């Protein structure tokens, strides 16, 4: 099949909004990764240092402008207006810093440039600034990409089976309980995952992203975990010096609250990319890499798609070709959608509606009852 070729798929690739929760195919697809790659224009795989830096520098300039306005003009506002200005700053700065987080994440995928040392340098600097242990998460995230959709080996947001639901689960299965759980997840989910592997796959031993001897890592990776920790400590020391000079309240308002927004968006984005009523999970008897990579969903965050460098609405392509730079992912997605057909899942439900729906509908997974594939698991919510 030549570039731009098409392979038959079970049904049309276009879905109505009422079809978004219909189960995607779980059979082995009639196409290969090679077929998908041939359909993508070759230039989409090329990484440009000037272009990559242009997005990073643009985000830095915007974040710096927000910081400058907040530090120089908010104190001049009458009190009622300052109560409006600070939440606006937190929301806007948190969104822009999430964009910087995404670019540092691309560095971990070697999608920023053709030079691994440059990618790692940029990624270490900017992930450390956002209190992310760069190399530590780079390696665990790489394993997530290698095992997406596997109930045994995926790294994060591994769904539970019904037997693993705690006794109090049924008491939280109501609107108030869901809102409470979502709030805890968005506020504490990211630091708890990094520190204690909460929502991650089980390991023998202390699975902590800051611990070089954690079972997450092999011997070749441990030295770089120390580098990640050094980056975090350096930023923490800088924050301490800033707080000592300018006050803790200033540090919290200018940096701490926007960082909470970043962490919340990170958890939300990841949660909605991998949690959806239509998506299967697989045990070892059924899982393979391609079907696992396709067990993801693209979402629509409106204008935030651009602010987040399209990590939200091109996630399927990202899982298939993770070294592709974000600025080519939209074109690549359009190229592969006709081949993917029903294997491609897009849900345009507003994120604030989708997060509640998924919290309600996707409580645990159970084996497929409608077919003969006992190694395929689907979400359910009947406790």
Curated annotation (Swiss-Prot):
Phenotype upon loss of function: Enhancement of both microviscosity and lipid/protein ratio of mitochondrial membranes, which in turn were responsible for the change in lateral mobility of lipids and for bioenergetic parameter modifications. Increased membrane rigidity and cold sensitivity. Hypersensitivity to salt or osmotic stress.
Keywords, sorted A to Z: Endoplasmic reticulum, Fatty acid biosynthesis, Fatty acid metabolism, Lipid biosynthesis, Lipid metabolism, Membrane, Microsome, Oxidoreductase, Transmembrane, Transmembrane helix
Job of this protein: ER (microsomal) omega-6 fatty acid desaturase introduces the second double bond in the biosynthesis of 18:3 fatty acids, important constituents of plant membranes. Delta(12)-desaturase with regioselectivity determined by the double bond (delta(9) position) and carboxyl group of the substrate. Can use both 16:1 and 18:1 fatty acids as substrates. It is thought to use cytochrome b5 as an electron donor and to act on fatty acids esterified to phosphatidylcholine (PC) and, possibly, other phospholipids. Very low constitutive hydroxylation activity.
Extent of motif Histidine box-2: 141-145
Known catalytic reactions: (9Z)-octadecenoyl-CoA + 2 Fe(II)-[cytochrome b5] + O2 + 2 H(+) = (9Z,12Z)-octadecadienoyl-CoA + 2 Fe(III)-[cytochrome b5] + 2 H2O; (9Z)-hexadecenoyl-CoA + 2 Fe(II)-[cytochrome b5] + O2 + 2 H(+) = (9Z,12Z)-hexadecadienoyl-CoA + 2 Fe(III)-[cytochrome b5] + 2 H2O; a (9Z)-octadecenoyl-containing glycerolipid + 2 Fe(II)-[cytochrome b5] + O2 + 2 H(+) = a (9Z,12Z)-octadecadienoyl-containing glycerolipid + 2 Fe(III)-[cytochrome b5] + 2 H2O; (9Z)-octadecenoyl-CoA + AH2 + O2 = (9Z,12Z)-octadecadienoyl-CoA + A + 2 H2O
InterPro entries: FA_desaturase_dom (IPR005804), FAS_N (IPR021863), Fatty_acid_desaturase (IPR012171)
Subunit structure comment from the entry: Homo- and heterodimer. Interacts with FAD3 but not with FAD6. FAD2-FAD3 heterodimers can form a metabolic channel in which 18:1-PC is converted to 18:3-PC without releasing a free 18:2-PC intermediate.
Protein name as it appears in the record: Delta(12)-fatty-acid desaturase
Gene transcribed to yield this protein: FAD2
Tissue expr: Expressed in shoots and roots. Expressed in leaves, stems, flowers and siliques.
Pathway(s) of this molecule: Lipid metabolism; polyunsaturated fatty acid biosynthesis
Swiss-Prot/TrEMBL GO biological process terms: unsaturated fatty acid biosynthetic process
Membrane-spanning segments: 56-76, 117-137, 179-199, 225-245, 252-272
Leftover remarks: Introduction of Ile at position 146 or 324 has a dominant role in specifying hydroxylation activity.
Region listing for Disordered, in residue ranges: 1-24
Gene Ontology MF term list: acyl-CoA (9+3)-desaturase activity; acyl-lipid omega-6 desaturase (cytochrome b5) activity; omega-6 fatty acid desaturase activity
Mode of membrane association: Multi-pass membrane protein
Motif (Histidine box-1): 105-109
Motif (Histidine box-3) on chain: 315-319
A GO cellular-component term linked to this record: endoplasmic reticulum membrane
Residues in the signal sequence: none
Annotated source species: Arabidopsis thaliana
Entry's free-text remark on domains: The histidine box domains may contain the active site and/or be involved in metal ion binding. The C-terminal sequence (-YNNKL) is necessary and sufficient for maintaining localization in the endoplasmic reticulum.
Induction behaviour: Up-regulated by osmotic stress. Not regulated by cold stress.
Subcellular location: Endoplasmic reticulum membrane; Microsome membrane
Family: Belongs to the fatty acid desaturase type 1 family.
Outcome of mutating residue 295 to V: In m7FAD2/L7M; Converted from a desaturase to a bifunctional desaturase/hydroxylase. In m4FAD2/L4M; Converted from a desaturase to a bifunctional desaturase/hydroxylase
EC number: 1.14.19.22, 1.14.19.6
């Amino acid at each position: 099949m030549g570039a731009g070729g098409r392979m038959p798929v079970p049904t049309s690739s276009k879905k109505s909004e009422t079809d978004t929760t219909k189960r995607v195919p779980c059979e082995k697809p009639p196409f290969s990764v090679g077929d998908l790659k041939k359909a993508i224009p070759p230039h989409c795989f090329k990484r440009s240092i000037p272009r990559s830096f242009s997005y990073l520098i643009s985000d830095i300039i915007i974040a710096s402008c927000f910081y400058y306005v907040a530090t120089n003009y908010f104190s001049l506002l009458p009190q009622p207006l300052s109560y409006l200005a600070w939440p606006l700053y937190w929301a806007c700065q948190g969104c822009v810093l999430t964009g910087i987080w995404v670019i540092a994440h691309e560095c971990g995928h070697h999608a920023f440039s053709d030079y691994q040392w440059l990618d790692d340098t940029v990624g270490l600097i900017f992930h450390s600034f956002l209190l992310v242990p760069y190399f530590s998460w780079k390696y665990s995230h790489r394993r997530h990409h290698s095992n997406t959709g596997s109930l045994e080996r995926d790294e994060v947001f591994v769904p539970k089976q019904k037997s693993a639901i705690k006794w109090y689960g049924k008491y939280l299965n109501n609107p108030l309980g869901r809102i409470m759980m979502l709030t805890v997840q968005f506020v504490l989910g990211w630091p708890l995952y990094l520190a204690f592997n909460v929502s991650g796959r089980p390991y023998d031993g202390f699975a902590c992203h800051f611990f070089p001897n954690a079972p997450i890592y092999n011997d070749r990776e441990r030295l770089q975990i120390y580098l990640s920790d050094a980056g975090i400590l350096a930023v923490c020391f800088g924050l301490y010096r800033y707080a000592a000079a300018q006050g803790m309240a200033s540090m919290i308002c200018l940096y701490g609250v926007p960082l909470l927004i970043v962490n919340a968006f990170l958890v939300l984005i990841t949660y909605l990319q991998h949690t959806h009523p239509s998506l299967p999970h697989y045990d070892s008897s059924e899982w393979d890499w391609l079907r696992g990579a396709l067990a993801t969903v693209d979402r629509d965050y409106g204008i935030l798609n651009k602010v987040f460098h399209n990590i939200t609405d091109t996630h399927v392509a990202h899982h298939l070709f993770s070294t592709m730079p974000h600025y080519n992912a939209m074109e690549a997605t359009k190229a592969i959608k006709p081949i993917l057909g029903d294997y491609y899942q897009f849900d345009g439900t507003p994120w604030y509606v989708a997060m509640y729906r998924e919290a309600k509908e996707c409580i645990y997974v159970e084996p497929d009852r409608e077919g003969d594939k006992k190694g395929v698991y689907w979400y359910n919510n009947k406790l």
